[in-house]
Amino acid sequence: MGWSLRMWIVSILVLTQLVNGALCWGDAGHYAVCKIAQSYFEEDTVVAVKKLLPESANGELAAVCSWPDEIKKLPQWRWTSALHFADTPDYKCNYEYSRDCPKDWCVTGAIFNYTNQLMSTSENSQSIVHYNLTEALMFLSHYMGDIHQPLHEGFIGDLGGNKIKVHWYNQETNLHRVWDDMIIESALETYYNSSLPRMIHELQAKLKNGWSNDVPSWESCQLNQTACPNPYASESIDLACKYAYRNATAGTTLGDYYFVSRLPVVEKRLAQGGIRLAGTLNRIFSAKRKLARA
């Protein structure tokens, strides 16, 4: 099966899930992050991203941002499974790259890796290594969403909440899925008439109003770095301890209070993920950076 056909099938599956309401950070959340990012692309980034996207995406990065989730269980892609998270020691509530990303094999390491691969398009490199830059773009875009989900930097002992069995209202599930899926799904049903575009529009409005003063600091990187995922991981485990794990022990029923008090955290992380993805891609594809390195 050719690349274009495989990507067309994956895109149809993702769009079908969105229409039918099978929504989670793995599809609705990632779609939102990438859709928000697209609205903050600089002109050079728009051109570069469209060149790299498969034809099936029709110029929409958001259409393929769930691709890494779609493929990670396939035999040839199982090696990518560990790149979606960075587990941290139980109850320490902090993140350290040297401790939590052994051999660079975690979500932060993946963000650095795929950033470097995409940067190869901006450098006069004589390297004999030829990367698949379409895959690099989709992996980077997806992992930038993952790192902003607090439980993707959760405790190693419970696998980021996957081992914590809870009820979301009357549905049996686990804590990780609550944050991947159910908070977003409940928000769509409760506030947005099950419309993902309406939710994204509301987040974009908040970025122009309530969060507008925060956007410059969200999108920037210290020390003139192109990518800076370590602070994002630190934020996530801090939020996991303060919000995700709190009052959510095994056997707990999570309802209105948990939903209403945690939804603002989820919404802000989606917005931050979008802004930071745009900032990273803008730095990668900036014409000024290309000229500076020429």
UniProtKB/Swiss-Prot annotation:
It comes from the Eukaryota. Optimum pH is 5.5 with RNA and ssDNA as substrates. Substrate binds at residues 25-30, 69-75, 84-87, 94-99, 113, 131. Residues 1-24 form the signal peptide. Residues 142-191 are annotated as: Substrate binding. GO terms for biological process: DNA catabolic process. Glycans are attached at residues 113, 132, 193, 224, 247. Its cofactor is Zn(2+); Mn(2+). SUPFAM superfamilies: Phospholipase C/P1 nuclease. InterPro entries: PLipase_C/P1_nuclease_dom_sf, S1/P1nuclease. One of its GO terms (molecular function) is nucleic acid binding. It catalyses: Endonucleolytic cleavage to 5'-phosphomononucleotide and 5'-phosphooligonucleotide end-products. A divalent metal cation 3 binds at residues 25, 30, 146. It is an enzyme of class 3 (hydrolase). A divalent metal cation 1 binds at residues 69, 84, 142, 146. Binds 3 divalent metal cations. Can use Mn(2+) with a lower efficiency than Zn(2+) ions. Keywords: Disulfide bond, Endonuclease, Glycoprotein, Hydrolase, Manganese, Metal-binding, Nuclease, Signal, Zinc. A divalent metal cation 2 binds at residues 152, 176, 180. Disulfide bonds join 34-65, 93-241, 101-106, 221-228. Monomer. Belongs to the nuclease type I family. This is Endonuclease 3. It comes from Arabidopsis thaliana.
